[in-house]
Amino acid sequence: MEDYVKIEKIGEGTYGVVYKGRHKSTGQVVAMKKIRLESEEEGVPSTAVREVSLLQELKHPNVVRLLDVLMQESRLYLIFEFLSMDLKKYLDSIPSGQYMDPMLVKSYLYQILEGIYFCHRRRVLHRDLKPQNLLIDNKGVIKLADFGLARAFGVPVRVYTHEVVTLWYRAPEVLLGSPRYSTPVDVWSTGTIFAELATKKPLFHGDSEIDQLFRIFRTLGTPNNDVWPDVESLPDYKNTFPKWMEGSLSSMVKNLDKNGLDLLAKMLIYNPPKRISAREAMTHPYFDDLDKSTLPAACINGV
């Protein structure tokens, strides 16, 4: 820790306080995340340190770089590259009655998918994607923060400040208590974020797990074994759930064209193996008119 100096507190992350800091000798500005864990008496589990150290290998223009993992007494500090703006703040800053430029929506979504595909190829899930951990710079680049932390530290029900962790972007298989889930959970979250990029409003904003599920069901219909094999045997599925018919996604997400709505629907398919993958989504016709050569990952993809 002696290599870094804290400048100011910049927020409360899922796992602890986040500071803006500076590397003493290079002057590089960084984000310093102090990890507080439930079982702090025993210190940080070595498994968590191992897991999180592996994340230093995730080097991609659309993934926030983990620069260093430091221990101080029983505290763990994660040192990340610094970006000053997140997607939630940016969406909140757009004046009432105005919306994000449709081409920027497309560019951001494509870049998010690039980052997710990169991590998924390396068998790293996010599990907690939301606008607050999508960071943006002033050049149109968007980066995913906190990739892999859920596996290292778990996803807490509450932030350490007792603020409830948002459920708005959580996939239905997670909400229904599936013991096994995989990369499709991140695609679902990205779909809900896609809708929010277009409308500035969360697509499904539940205030409890059951309210969250019912908001999804009201729009997409209550799932059963016909549309999602074995859903009825998931731990938190109840046969007493109200049986809603499928509603209209297009009436809720008015700012997307036909291709955009088609891609969104494919990202919000109930049955996880049938849900479009990040890689497949990147080849969807919605992106045909996006100039991918200007995107930050173009150089590594040989676009």
From Swiss-Prot:
Gene3D superfamilies: Phosphorylase Kinase, domain 1 (3.30.200.20), Transferase(Phosphotransferase) domain 1 (1.10.510.10). Phosphorylation at Thr-14 or Tyr-15 inactivates the enzyme, while phosphorylation at Thr-161 activates it. Residues 4-287 form the Protein kinase domain. GO terms for cellular component: centrosome; cytoplasm; nucleus. The modification Phosphotyrosine is found at residue 15. It comes from the Eukaryota. InterPro entries: CDK (IPR050108), Kinase-like_dom_sf (IPR011009), Prot_kinase_dom (IPR000719), Protein_kinase_ATP_BS (IPR017441), Ser/Thr_kinase_AS (IPR008271). Signal peptide: none annotated. Its EC number is 2.7.11.22, 2.7.11.23. SMART domains: S_TKc. GO terms for molecular function: ATP binding; cyclin-dependent protein serine/threonine kinase activity; protein serine kinase activity; RNA polymerase II CTD heptapeptide repeat kinase activity. The modification Phosphothreonine is found at residues 14, 161. Keywords: ATP-binding, Cell cycle, Cell division, Cytoplasm, Cytoskeleton, Kinase, Mitosis, Nucleotide-binding, Nucleus, Phosphoprotein, Serine/threonine-protein kinase, Transferase. The active site is at 128 (proton acceptor). GO terms for biological process: cell division; G2/M transition of mitotic cell cycle; mitotic G2 DNA damage checkpoint signaling. Phosphorylation at Tyr-15 by wee1 and wee2 inhibits the protein kinase activity and acts negative regulator of entry into mitosis (G2 to M transition). Transmembrane segments: none annotated. ATP binds at residues 10-18, 33. It is an enzyme of class 2 (transferase). Forms a stable but non-covalent complex with cyclin B in mature oocytes. Plays a key role in the control of the eukaryotic cell cycle by modulating the centrosome cycle as well as mitotic onset; promotes G2-M transition via association with multiple interphase cyclins. During G2 and early mitosis, CDC25A/B/C-mediated dephosphorylation activates CDK1/cyclin complexes which phosphorylate several substrates that trigger at least centrosome separation, Golgi dynamics, nuclear envelope breakdown and chromosome condensation. Belongs to the protein kinase superfamily. CMGC Ser/Thr protein kinase family. CDC2/CDKX subfamily. This is Cyclin-dependent kinase 1. It comes from Oryzias javanicus. The lineage of its organism: Eukaryota, Metazoa, Chordata, Craniata, Vertebrata.
